[in-house]
Design a protein with these regions (language model features):
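ABC family nucleotide-binding domain
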Residues: 1-141
Length: 141
């Protein structure tokens, strides 16, 4: 949209709410279940009620193929599954764009494809993504 983030009149906090971030190391909360990880930000920042946040989280977990893992803890998931939870968590804030910092570099090679499939589906749905990576397979997105 051509926003000048250096402009003193730019509401940087509002801009940050429009951009999601997915990190290399997932950064999931280990003492929260998968669904709680996805629900947390909308409840705390958008003041969404818990029932609505739970329903939205389950919808997003289904979108990344992990609805059946909603009530487990991150430590029980593979790296690829944890990264997909991180993607669902970023999507829970309904961003206009997603930033990915090496989304596949911490994964075993066999887990890379499941994360790439989610990213391809997001691209097909029109999600703007900025990806920093060394993974050449991502070029096809």
């Amino acid at each position: 949209e051509g926003k000048n983030l250096l402009d003193k009149n730019c509401d940087i906090r509002k801009f940050r709410e429009e951009v999601g971030m997915v990190f290399q190391k997932f950064n999931l909360f280990p003492l929260k279940t998968v669904v709680q990880n996805v629900m947390m930000a909308p409840i705390l920042t958008k003041h969404m009620n818990k029932e609505e946040a739970h329903a939205k989280a389950l919808e997003l977990l289904d979108k990344v193929g992990l609805k059946d893992k909603a009530d487990v803890y991150p430590s029980t998931l593979s790296g690829g599954q944890q990264q997909r939870v991180a993607i669902a968590r970023a999507l829970a804030m309904e961003p206009k764009a997603l930033l990915f910092d090496e989304p596949t570099s911490a994964l075993d090679p066999e887990m890379v494809e499941e994360v790439l499939k989610v990213m391809v589906n997001l691209a097909k749905q029109g999600m703007t993504m900025i990806v920093v990576t060394h993974c050449l397979a991502i070029r096809s997105i």
